[in-house]
Amino acid sequence: MAAHHRQNTAGRRKVQVSYVIRDEVEKYNRNGVNALQLDPALNRLFTAGRDSIIRIWSVNQHKQDPYIASMEHHTDWVNDIVLCCNGKTLISASSDTTVKVWNAHKGFCMSTLRTHKDYVKALAYAKDKELVASAGLDRQIFLWDVNTLTALTASNNTVTTSSLSGNKDSIYSLAMNQLGTIIVSGSTEKVLRVWDPRTCAKLMKLKGHTDNVKALLLNRDGTQCLSGSSDGTIRLWSLGQQRCIATYRVHDEGVWALQVNDAFTHVYSGGRDRKIYCTDLRNPDIRVLICEEKAPVLKMELDRSADPPPAIWVATTKSTVNKWTLKGIHNFRASGDYDNDCTNPITPLCTQPDQVIKGGASIIQCHILNDKRHILTKDTNNNVAYWVSVKDAGFSSPDGSDPKLNLGGLLLQALLEYWPRTHVNPMDEEENEVNHVNGEQENRVQKGNGYFQVPPHTPVIFGEAGGRTLFRLLCRDSGGETESMLLNETVPQWVIDITVDKNMPKFNKIPFYLQPHASSGAKTLKKDRLSASDMLQVRKVMEHVYEKIINLDNESQTTSSSNNEKPGEQEKEEDIAVLAEEKIELLCQDQVLDPNMDLRTVKHFIWKSGGDLTLHYRQKST
């Protein structure tokens, strides 16, 4: 992802423009998968994670390619998803601070809720009431009626919400029973807080955990709650008694994910130690190690197509999602106490997953080299790649000087070239009238920057620098009526200046001093402070030295012998550059400069000190 940002003086808000360099279709999860939802009716699995994309997969094992579609609108991690309305609607929560409502069958975003002020970390769903709750790092819990959310339109886009207040710390987990009568939240406060969503009343606070509560589950009638914590324990709570009635020490490290069967008799747990256990809640000595993943477990989803569940889907900090069979899981016996003796380790029920949804690699490190063209990256597969931002065209060097271009401005024009407001009609009014009279009025609209284009599928994101997203769209969609209207409201003035008014920002100037080198024996000049664009190449300074300093000295020495002829008049302008490079050397810190360098490079990589840049010149020895 690349970005440009400026201060928006109108709203006193810093607006950042970002874009994503990617393939048109991103079929693979590119990082850890935070959330899973299974639609057994359509045999579809929804995955969402750290690459901001929600993907739909077929879980039919007979399909060679399980990928179905991607749902893209978020601009940061997707932390949780829930399927509602019998699989027709999907709700998602993201670190971009939004909650989004999706048509799960057609795969498009229907509406965006911007009530939260920080990362939205967890969702909870009451199936019988079609009620969803969202919570996050802003310590707020909001309640949403799903039927109201799905009825929102461009003209009818107002929605009311109830909120549950009282949390003192960031919320990382949330649960609501199917009847919609109880909500429980878990946070870094290390307690469970309980509300009645019907009245928004606080009911109780449950203490017992010693670290962040990362996972919560409620039984159907809301009388019992299971919690998993970074303290490594699973606790069973009686809400009627308002106390913990059982503690299960199954894992060696933090418990981050829980699932439970419909009868609320067996809990499936996973976490930082990469192990997935099934524990009998009625007899905690009866537990089985189902499998061991290759990375910490973030989320699990039971296949509830039968009872007992035949399989469980597991997502980890890696991009691959695995399905593990649960056949034969209830044929095990008590395994003794919970102290996992390393000399007698428990054998996993499964050593290989039953089905694999393969993920892709993601870039985890990058370094831009000094030439600002080449980049080194390292991905999650430990592959190091060497990239170049601009390919050599293979043409010979053109005659004359290179044009001065602002690549950032050209890029902004390319990103918004489909936005009608940026289009320019070069015909003046008189030409328009003549062509109209002659019946020759033609479409001569100029789009883009005239140099290059970006792929139409490129995502463009406007957002507050270091904060929330204001608007996201694909390049090709900026011509749409709705998108154009939103761009008019969102695009900051500094981008308007470049893309609509075609006013490129002025080049930065660098002040410098120009003096003869000590070895030249020339008299030191009056120390005049010069300035030039930081993009100015060293060869241009050499031309200045040759034409304005060396040539003037030669003229004064040869005036009597040359009569009315002057060397400067005899030389063609294009020859000056060649002669300057043949006869002049420019130095900084006693290092001879490459004529292709620009002043910015000289200042940052050779001068390397405070104060104004000082350059020295001398004539090459013949």
Swiss-Prot record:
At the top level, the lineage of the source is Eukaryota
From the Swiss-Prot or TrEMBL record, state where the protein is found. Nucleus; Cytoplasm; Lysosome; Late endosome
Q: List the disulfide bonds.
A: none
Give the modified residues of type Phosphothreonine: 558
Which PROSITE patterns does UniProt cross-reference here?
A: WD_REPEATS_1, WD_REPEATS_2, WD_REPEATS_REGION
Q: What biological-process GO terms show up in the record?
A: DNA damage response; double-strand break repair via homologous recombination; positive regulation of double-strand break repair via homologous recombination
Modified-residue entries (N6-acetyllysine), positions: 214, 523
What information about domains appears in the record's comments? The WD repeats are required for the interaction with deubiquitinating enzymes USP1, USP12 and USP46.
The similarity comment for this entry is: Belongs to the WD repeat WDR48 family.
Query: Which PANTHER family has this protein been placed in?
Result: WD REPEAT-CONTAINING PROTEIN 48 (PTHR19862:SF14)
Task: Name the chain's protein.
Answer: WD repeat-containing protein 48
User: Top-down, what is the taxonomic lineage of the species of origin?
Assistant: Eukaryota, Metazoa, Chordata, Craniata, Vertebrata
